[in-house]
């Protein structure tokens, strides 16, 4: 079974909205072994909708449409499809009761417009909308498009996602005829080319039914290993074998084989070891602390964060020696080390990290170009002494990208030090 996704809405074509629905649907379908061969974006015009649906139904066994279901004048999908299939409308009583109850609980009258929302195309299966009002539909398109299924869902992401998870995926999973396993391999501190060179033997010997996708992002690159086949046990075993082969080749750069962020791994390790962390930031402007505290449960390990953007703040709040700044500059490994040590001593944390750098677009020099960052790490040793180290990196991006990459470098430093610490 192959699928095509159609995203309907003038707002998508005009660039007023980003289409997040199509990637979500593609991922959900991929998880049950249904590949997406095409994604179409079309306007709210009824003829454009009919043309897009006709094309899709001639090419794929399953077509998934989002957008154009609802009470407003630009919600034209249902009627366009009804006309294409030559069918009437029928009231779906459960949907109407759900809509009526939704408005009664808000002390609003039930109108004919609301009743119209509960009308579905004859012969369809109504998809309950647990996050809104307009129901979706699963339609068998015979006789004109025999053997084809058409799914209509609202364009509101929360409504569509609930329909996919609760109704659509369970409906189509038994029809896919295949099992599929996706396993992410999350890496840190390595570029796409270097990673590809490192695992070239694994990639050259991939078995039939297994693919490897490189997923570059602002902070680096990760991999997605996908395996499909007729027997779940074989699929799982083959997928696991390939993942293990990648980890064997690139292990020191791999921080997880599940979809977790680097900050989640760091926070979970801190919590597991009952350690606390504090951060002293300059060039990242609070981003590092924000990423750590985005992780649920981080209050159990994150003590405090200081944004010491100016040299005066570094001296006053962290105890950085003005002579160190004078001799080496604020963006230097000696300053990063003093920032990390000062943060550790003043916070009482078990480990601390500092960032000082040049995010750009100005401020760079030949010796310290834009994108330079120095990361300091300080941690307590079992004998009460303090271990302090710093490293310098040069990133290549705009100001926003550099700040993300700077924070990623700091998280990498934290993770490496945590794995080295003795207890």
UniProtKB/Swiss-Prot annotation:
SMART domains xref list: MoCF_biosynth
Protein name: CinA-like protein
Source superkingdom: Bacteria
NCBIfam families hit by this protein: cinA_nterm (TIGR00200), PncC_domain (TIGR00199), PRK00549.1 (NF001813)
InterPro entries for this protein: CinA (IPR050101), CinA-like_C (IPR036653), CinA_C (IPR008136), CinA_KH (IPR041424), Competence-induced_CinA (IPR008135), MoaB/Mog-like_dom_sf (IPR036425), MoaB/Mog_dom (IPR001453)
Cysteine disulfide links: none
Family per record: Belongs to the CinA family.
Gene3D superfamilies: CinA-like, MoaB/Mog-like domain
PANTHER family according to UniProt: NICOTINAMIDE-NUCLEOTIDE AMIDOHYDROLASE PNCC (PTHR13939), NMN AMIDOHYDROLASE-LIKE PROTEIN YFAY (PTHR13939:SF0)
């Amino acid at each position: 079974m192959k699928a095509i996704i159609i995203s309907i809405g003038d707002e998508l074509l005009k660039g007023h909205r980003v289409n997040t629905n199509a990637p979500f649907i593609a991922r959900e379908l991929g998880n049950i072994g249904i590949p997406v061969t095409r994604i179409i974006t079309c306007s709210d015009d009824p003829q454009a909708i009919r043309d897009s649906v006709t094309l899709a139904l001639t090419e794929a066994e399953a077509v998934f449409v989002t957008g154009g279901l609802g009470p407003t004048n630009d919600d034209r999908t249902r009627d366009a499809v009804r006309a294409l299939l030559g069918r009437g409308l029928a009231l779906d009583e459960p949907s109407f009761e759900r809509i009526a109850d939704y408005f009664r609980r808000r002390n609003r009258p039930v109108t004919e417009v609301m009743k119209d929302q509960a009308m579905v195309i004859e012969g369809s299966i109504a998809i309950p909308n647990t996050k809104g009002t307009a129901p979706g539909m699963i339609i068998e398109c015979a006789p004109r498009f025999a053997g084809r299924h058409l799914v209509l869902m609202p364009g509101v992401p929360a409504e569509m996602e609930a329909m996919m998870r609760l109704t659509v995926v369970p409906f189509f999973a038994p029809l896919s005829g295949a099992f599929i396993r996706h396993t992410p391999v999350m890496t840190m501190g390595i570029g796409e080319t270097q990673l590809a060179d490192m695992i070239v033997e694994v990639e050259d010997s991939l078995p039939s039914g297994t693919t490897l996708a490189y997923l570059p992002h602002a902070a680096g690159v990760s991999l997605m290993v996908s395996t499909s086949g007729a027997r779940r046990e074989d699929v799982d075993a083959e997928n696991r074998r390939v993942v293990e082969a990648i980890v064997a080749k690139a292990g020191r750069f791999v921080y997880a084989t599940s979809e977790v962020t680097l900050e989640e791994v760091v926070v979970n390790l801190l919590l597991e070891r009952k350690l606390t962390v504090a951060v002293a930031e300059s060039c990242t402007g609070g981003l590092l602390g924000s990423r750590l505290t985005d992780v649920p449960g981080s209050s159990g390990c994150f003590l405090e964060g200081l944004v010491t953007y100016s040299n005066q703040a570094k001296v006053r709040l962290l105890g950085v020696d003005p002579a160190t700044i004078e001799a080496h500059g604020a963006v230097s490994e000696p300053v990063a080390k003093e920032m990390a040590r000062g943060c550790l001593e003043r916070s009482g944390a078990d480990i601390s990290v500092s960032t000082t750098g040049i995010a750009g677009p100005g401020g760079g020099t030949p010796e310290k170009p834009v994108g330079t960052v120095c990361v300091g790490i300080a941690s307590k040793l079992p004998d009460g002494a303090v271990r302090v180290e710093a490293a310098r990196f040069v990133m290549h991006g705009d100001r926003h990208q550099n700040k993300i990459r700077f924070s990623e470098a700091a998280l990498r430093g934290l993770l490496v030090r945590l794995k080295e610490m003795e207890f």
